[in-house]
Amino acid sequence: MPAYELSAPYTPKGDQPTAISKLVEGVNGGERYQTLLGATGTGKTFTMANVIAQTGRPALVLAHNKTLAAQLCNELREFFPHNAVEYFISYYDYYQPEAYVPVSDTYIAKTASINEEIDMLRHSATRSLFERRDVIVVASISCIYGLGIPSEYLKAAVPFKVGETLNLRGSLRDLVNNQYSRNDTEAGRGRFRVKGDVLEIGPAYDDRLVRVELFGDEVEAIRYVDPTTGEILQSLDAISIYPAKHFVTPKERLNDAVKAIRSELKERLEFLNGEGKLLEAQRLEQRATYDLEMLQQIGYCNGVENYARHLAGREPGSAPECLIDYFPDDWLLIVDESHVTCSQLLAMYNGDQARKKVLIDHGFRLPSAADNRPLKSEEFWSKAKQTVFVSATPGNWEMEVSEGQVAEQVIRPTGVLDPLVEVRPTTGQVDDLLGEIRDRASKKQRVLVTTLTKRMAEDLTDYLAENKVRVRYLHSEIHSIERIEIIQDLRLGEYDVLVGVNLLREGLDLPEVSLVAILDADKEGFLRAQRSLIQTIGRAARHVEGKALLYAETMTDSMAKAIEETERRRKIQHTYNEKHGITPTAAGKKASNSILSFLELSRKLKADGPDADLVKVAGKAVQALEEDVDGLALDALPELIDQLELKMKESAKKLDFEEAANLRDRIKKLRQKLVGSSR
């Protein structure tokens, strides 16, 4: 019997039953690669859910960005309310990797800001994979990075069972070894406290406390309790408390790792000295020797991940263990928006290695640091035994490896046709667009506008705002959770128009959007290629009055093919509707917000509103950069710090580490002044 319980107020319709049947048959028959070629709004996620439910396997649903992953997680949680649907993305709010710039002899240390709530969700995912089979993990591409050793993580879990004798001192020691800290004053995630015969633990994977009640040496009761009120939420017979970090190194393995690091250091120093690189040799010896001392004394050092190969006991060049290795052997991979996601897999490894090579060549790291890396594309696919690619525009590679195992899904259960596509001249495009926006807004419909450049998007947003249009600009500096909030606000009618560059194409489920406007549609390139145009047009495919405006002076080959494919689908859909007497109806899908609700960040993000006066604030920040810190007004400091952090993150993304480091130092100075003023 399948382990999943699919809950939905409707049954498969249109060509969904055929697609589901073909994909399930392929999975059960051992097909390695299959493709679901589904037009936007045809219910691809519902088809995916049915395939997962009918095959009964643990599943990894891979998305190409955090926003899409959150949306998929929300939808799958609605389909599987009684099963484990987990969310696994990068837990960094900000991450600047360690780097060295030889031209200016500048070393930049790693700096990062970890989102504790997302870290909790990551631990929840791995815990579910150990304890049950009805697990769906929705992940971003960050799942291909190293994640400890699953066998050691499982082995290190501290068990508690009602009725069994407990060595309390031994359990406390095990918790400390698993990187939990004792705090008898304040309980919380990653901490524990002891009061008499009661042990309370804040597991890494939950925001509830685990209370273990003892009678002498015997476990009398185990309960989940509310950390704030102390209310008993659930009684348990047994529980395993997994480590607070995924990276767990037993003492004997740590000793072996130290020996291996010393051996590699000796060999590398001989090489550098032989090459006459005396400065590099001295630098490496000093850094590595200090790290070794820290590892021996406390089992940890800054940059410990650079010794991951030795700590895991892996061979040189071998693949790291990642989230995939926490799955059982018969797991199923579903790659959403595969034409984008598969390309990301190719790029991650190369970018990581280029940066590390500079650090190794200049004596900042041992060569083994290069093995602290994401999976190579071929390593990833060797671990994925069965895959279903999902896309409205699958790439050539996916279609090739699927070898005819393609299920096409064109008919929408709602009967809604693909959008009408109209080409209009670029002359006066902004004023023409303004009129269209006002018309749609009067009907309480939403509009998406995509431009070619960030500057154009900013200018258009300003212009629309000046003309009393409720508009927001979705840009790359916005944190993942806030991005979800902005999209939710569009759906809820907080504003009518969302402007962006390359953030509005794949997978965003926005039934309220009736108009998509593509400015400069005839400018050939990645953003105006056939696949990109089809995806962007598809953002209006869930609305009965869906329409796409392409502003262009000439008809490019990409435009012609995109329009031709859209018309082909419209004809198929129209014929099906006539044959079955179907009248197109609105999707009526509620604006789910479960991820934000779970993290309890929704209202906080709305209150922060960092983009409301983005242009004005950025101007103040630039001006302040040229002024002496001592001359700044105190009430301007928080605003300035926020903007400098945005600039710092943008610089890090562009690999301009010198500028990012300068901004980081500036931020520290401003914060010191702010703290000093409050004393």
From Swiss-Prot:
Residue positions of motif Beta-hairpin: 91-114
An example Gene Ontology molecular-function term: excinuclease ABC activity
One Gene Ontology CC term in the entry: cytoplasm
Origin superkingdom: Bacteria
Binding site for ATP: G38, A39, T40, G41, T42, G43, K44, T45
Pfam family, one: ResIII
Residue stretches making up the Helicase C-terminal domain: 429-591
Annotated ranges, domain Helicase ATP-binding: 25-176
Stretches assigned to the UVR domain: 638-673
Residues in the signal sequence: none
Gene3D superfamilies listed in its UniProt record: P-loop containing nucleotide triphosphate hydrolases, UVR domain
UniProt keyword terms in alphabetical order: ATP-binding, Cytoplasm, DNA damage, DNA excision, DNA repair, Excision nuclease, Helicase, Hydrolase, Nucleotide-binding, SOS response
BP-aspect Gene Ontology terms: nucleotide-excision repair; SOS response
Cellular localisation: Cytoplasm
PROSITE patterns, A to Z: HELICASE_ATP_BIND_1 (PS51192), HELICASE_CTER (PS51194), UVR (PS50151)
Alphabetized NCBIfam families for the sequence: PRK05298.1 (NF003673), uvrb (TIGR00631)
Subunit structure: Forms a heterotetramer with UvrA during the search for lesions. Interacts with UvrC in an incision complex.
Record-stated family: Belongs to the UvrB family.
Domains: entry comment: The beta-hairpin motif is involved in DNA binding.
Function as written in the Swiss-Prot or TrEMBL entry: The UvrABC repair system catalyzes the recognition and processing of DNA lesions. A damage recognition complex composed of 2 UvrA and 2 UvrB subunits scans DNA for abnormalities. Upon binding of the UvrA(2)B(2) complex to a putative damaged site, the DNA wraps around one UvrB monomer. DNA wrap is dependent on ATP binding by UvrB and probably causes local melting of the DNA helix, facilitating insertion of UvrB beta-hairpin between the DNA strands. Then UvrB probes one DNA strand for the presence of a lesion.
Protein name in UniProt: UvrABC system protein B
Source taxonomy: Bacteria, Bacillati, Cyanobacteriota, Cyanophyceae, Synechococcales
Gene designation: uvrB
